């Protein structure tokens, strides 16, 4: 049946009527509003290293140069202590701890681990700091992934041996066997994890029932992308395949929940280009993630608009299908306020200004932790990313300390549901272990 797509943009006052196959879409563009936000901690140790010593210090009463130096020294001490532990425990498990390896093996391994430990902070700062050197990033990210997996399995091996010892079983396996087992398991997981990170994400399909959704919107198909993180590894071909997969899903709405890329817009323009080929019947919407605020947040908002996406920069659209309407709202990431960019902060009140309170609302907010505000504002469904599902097990347990949910559909309060994507790409270490990437197809159902 032929219909009329109608788009109204309050910002420019333009009205365009186009004969097309589909339903009516009404887009209401609101100017960014000011609001409140809370700072989020650095995603990983790598982020902390890239930022430590370079973050501005707010001058308040009683804060002088000596106190600022003490704070900076304290941060460095914590970061360096964590680094030493991350590198030292795997070396001790693999090459010391009574393994009785020949002395040359012990010495060479110590030199290799020490060199990696000393080089890692330099590479991180060169790669993820202001210089943004891709080669340094690739090396540092790979080192971080390898060391994290070795560290995790070294801890597990020590805990298992301790449990056996305390239970009176003794040590059924010699230290050398344990070290070989840790190395083999880690190598296997890293090989598999690299494949998981680089492959085309699988499509995860899920029905979500929204009691306030009109029957005309029943069956609305919402494709969710998040955390593509185009970065120092050129994934232009992967990006094109993701776009093809999205187009095959015949979506009504496509959402990108932030963290498009790491690096400058000029560095990642080619990898992001396939985003412009994605199709939807009603809308393609995007919000900023925390990584946009490590670089060019406003630049990415403008570029996504050039690629045909609606940037929900504390604003909303209203889409109509089958005579029923749905509000698509979005807010900046919660770290936006600390970026000092004018008009950038998470502001749900501004995003919903002028929206009919009787209509159901789908909110896109990068971090799951924003669901507290969403539930308080009566949001029906929040879509988020950020967590990567932990990306490399067992990092998911650390993520859970900062976020209410790591992955999946959850309920918060009487009305609000939250869907948290594990992400479409990966950040930093090119590995995904027990946290597969996804392209999500949410089918909205009326009660």
Feature locations, PLM:
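Hydrophobic alpha-helical transmembrane segments in integral membrane proteins
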Residues: 176-180, 187-212, 232-237, 295
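Soluble catalytic domains of enzymes that build or remodel membrane lipids, polysaccharides, and related
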Residues: 209-447
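Non-catalytic terminal accessory segments
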Residues: 1-199
């Amino acid at each position: 049946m032929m219909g009329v797509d109608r788009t109204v943009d309050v910002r420019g006052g333009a009205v365009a009527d186009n004969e097309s196959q589909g339903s009516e879409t009404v887009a209401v563009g609101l100017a960014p509003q000011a609001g409140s936000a809370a700072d989020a901690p650095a995603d990983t140790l790598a982020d902390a290293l890239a930022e430590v010593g370079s973050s501005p210090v707010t001058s308040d009463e009683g804060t002088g140069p000596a106190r600022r130096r003490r704070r900076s020294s304290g941060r460095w001490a914590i970061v360096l202590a964590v680094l030493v532990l991350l590198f030292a425990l795997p070396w001790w498990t693999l090459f010391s701890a009574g393994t009785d390896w020949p002395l040359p093996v012990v010495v060479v391994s110590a030199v290799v681990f020490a060199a990696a430990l000393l080089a890692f902070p330099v590479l991180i700062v060169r790669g993820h700091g202001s210089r943004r050197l891709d080669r340094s990033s690739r090396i540092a990210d790979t080192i971080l992934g390898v060391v994290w997996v070795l560290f995790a399995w070294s801890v597990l091996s020590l805990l298992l041996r301790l449990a056996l010892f305390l239970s009176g079983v003794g040590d059924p396996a010699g230290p050398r066997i344990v070290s070989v087992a840790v190395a083999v398991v880690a190598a296997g997981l890293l090989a598999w994890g690299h494949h998981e990170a680089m492959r085309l994400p699988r499509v995860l399909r899920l029905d979500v029932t929204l009691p306030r959704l009109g029957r005309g919107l029943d069956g609305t198909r919402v494709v969710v992308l998040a955390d593509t993180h185009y970065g120092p590894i050129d994934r232009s071909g992967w990006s094109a395949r993701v776009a093809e997969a999205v187009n095959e899903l015949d979506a009504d709405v496509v959402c990108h929940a932030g963290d498009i890329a790491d690096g400058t817009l000029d560095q990642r323009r080619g990898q992001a280009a396939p985003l412009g080929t994605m199709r939807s019947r009603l809308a393609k919407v995007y919000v900023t993630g925390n990584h946009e605020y490590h670089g060019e947040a406003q630049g990415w908002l403008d570029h996504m608009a050039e690629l045909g996406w609606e940037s929900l920069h504390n604003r909303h659209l209203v889409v109509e299908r089958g005579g029923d309407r749905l509000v698509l709202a979005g807010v900046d990431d919660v770290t936006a306020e600390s970026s000092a960019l004018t008009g950038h902060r998470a502001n749900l009140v501004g995003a919903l200004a002028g929206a009919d309170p009787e209509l159901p609302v789908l909110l896109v907010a990068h971090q799951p932790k924003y669901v507290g505000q969403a539930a308080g504002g009566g949001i029906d469904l929040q879509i988020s990313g950020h967590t990567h599902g932990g990306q490399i097990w067992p990092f998911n347990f650390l993520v859970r300390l900062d976020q209410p949910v790591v992955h999946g559909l959850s309920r918060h309060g009487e009305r609000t549901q939250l869907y948290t994507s594990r992400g479409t790409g990966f950040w930093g270490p090119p590995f995904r272990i027990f946290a597969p990437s996804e392209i999500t197809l949410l089918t909205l159902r009326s009660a």
